Amino acid sequence: MELNGLRVSRETQARLQHFAALFQKWAKTINLVAPSTLDDLWHRHIADSSQIFQICPEPIRWADLGSGGGFPGVITAIFLAELQDGWAHLVESNHKKAAFLMTALRETEARGSVHAIRIEDAPAEIGECGAISARALADLDGLIGYAAPWMLGKENCRGFFHKGRDYLREIDEARGRWEFDLVEHKSAVEQESVILEISNLRRLV
């Protein structure tokens, strides 16, 4: 099996398929993603989320902010299980969604844990990480603000943020408050979308 050109082992494929089935079951009772996208779960959410691990396939500590339905946090944790190293810390303050995430990580035997706390409280609980991820959470300025406690002054910590067609405007707005190195990774799933890789973060104001 391949996802966006990434070769996926049988074990990882089985984990992803189990997660997809679990997701569809839970989505009937709690709002995990927009209902209109459920029929395209593999393409719109699973394949899209896997792109972050393709960009950064390293056994490091991740903090996934506002994990919601598990994208990209659970997907990253599933890929880390194949490496048998690294860890994904999923931050989700909604307790129903956090319960789903805990179930998903346990049943897929993924390498991750859930923190049912506010994002602002997460840095003190989680500690240092090598990567921060988020998808459909806030504008870039807001995301950088959330990630700043991990990233400021830390050359080895990078942010990976999914963004849609307005990403250039969001970059301009964020540069009014922050200075950072930026790599734009074009999405292999959504034509007008990107994954923004942020590093060497400095605060301007």
Curated annotation (Swiss-Prot):
Q: Does the keyword Nucleotide-binding apply?
A: no
Please report the name of this protein according to its UniProt entry. Answer: Ribosomal RNA small subunit methyltransferase G
Per the record, the similarity remark reads: Belongs to the methyltransferase superfamily. RNA methyltransferase RsmG family.
* Molecular function GO terms recorded: rRNA (guanine-N7-)-methyltransferase activity
Reaction(s) this enzyme catalyzes, per UniProt: guanosine(527) in 16S rRNA + S-adenosyl-L-methionine = N(7)-methylguanosine(527) in 16S rRNA + S-adenosyl-L-homocysteine
Show the taxonomic lineage. Bacteria, Pseudomonadati, Pseudomonadota, Alphaproteobacteria, Hyphomicrobiales
| Catalytic class of the enzyme | transferase
The scientific name of the source species is Rhizobium etli (strain CIAT 652)
Q: Which residues bind S-adenosyl-L-methionine?
A: 66, 71, 119-120, 135
Note the SUPFAM superfamilies from the entry.
Answer: S-adenosyl-L-methionine-dependent methyltransferases
- Tell where it localizes: Cytoplasm
Give the matching Pfam families: GidB
Q: Which domain of life is it from?
A: Bacteria
Which coarse location class applies to the principal site listed for this UniProt protein?
cytoplasm
Q: Which gene encodes it?
A: rsmG
GO annotations of cellular component type:
cytosol
Q: What does this protein do?
A: Specifically methylates the N7 position of guanine in position 527 of 16S rRNA.
